[in-house]
């Protein structure tokens, strides 16, 4: 069983994952580890705002996600801190968020087909108001979140619409929940769906 946590930056995904590690050791946690992709992008001097470079960058990300999924399915139940659904969403929608009308589906058909075979069984979309997200961001000094405002303003409207319409997505509003309560709710959700 592959589960995935979704939502905006600063919504509480990492905090919920840490809660699971402490309170649900029977669930394998699969974090996004993108250090090698970022290093390769820098080494090659790729710019995500240039079409051909963007395609090369996304090939790296898509390949990385397929590898990650293959490791996650070795466990009876894994939860992804963003799964294949995130890289699919971002690959298709980032150009729209910068006003670009790039052809993505055909240009990355093989890679998108492969990542689409890696989709989670269930997705829990953690959602909160923009005010709560900004507050969480301000109170978290452990991360820089340089892309936060762009993500909130341009990506989140697309992301909400993209995920809310999917049949395998559940939504958890976290506006009035403490970090502990979010962790508990995420654990309860996992326990319902894990086999």
Task: Please give the residue ranges for each predicted region.
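NTP-dependent small-molecule kinase module
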Residues: 135-195
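Walker A/P-loop
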Residues: 14
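Hydrophobic anchor at the beta1->P-loop junction of P-loop NTPases
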Residues: 5
């Amino acid at each position: 069983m592959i589960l995935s946590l979704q939502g905006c930056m600063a919504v509480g995904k990492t905090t919920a994952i840490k809660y699971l590690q402490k309170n649900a050791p029977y669930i394998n946690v699969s974090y996004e580890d993108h250090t090698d992709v970022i290093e390769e992008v820098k080494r090659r001097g790729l710019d995500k705002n240039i079409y051909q470079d963007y395609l090369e960058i996304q090939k790296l990300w898509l390949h990385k996600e397929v590898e990650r999924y293959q490791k996650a399915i070795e466990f009876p139940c894994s939860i992804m801190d963003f799964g294949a659904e995130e890289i699919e969403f971002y690959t298709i929608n980032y150009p729209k968020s910068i006003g670009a009308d790039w052809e993505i589906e055909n240009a990355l058909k093989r890679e998108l087909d492969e990542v689409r075979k890696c989709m989670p069984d269930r997705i829990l979309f953690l959602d909160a108001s923009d005010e709560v997200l900004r507050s969480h961001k301000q109170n978290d000094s452990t991360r820089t979140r340089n892309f936060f405002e762009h993500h909130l303003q341009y990506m989140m409207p697309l992301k909400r619409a993209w995920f809310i319409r999917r049949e395998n997505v559940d939504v958890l509003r976290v506006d009035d929940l403490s970090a502990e309560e979010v962790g508990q709710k995420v654990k309860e959700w996992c326990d319902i769906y894990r086999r």
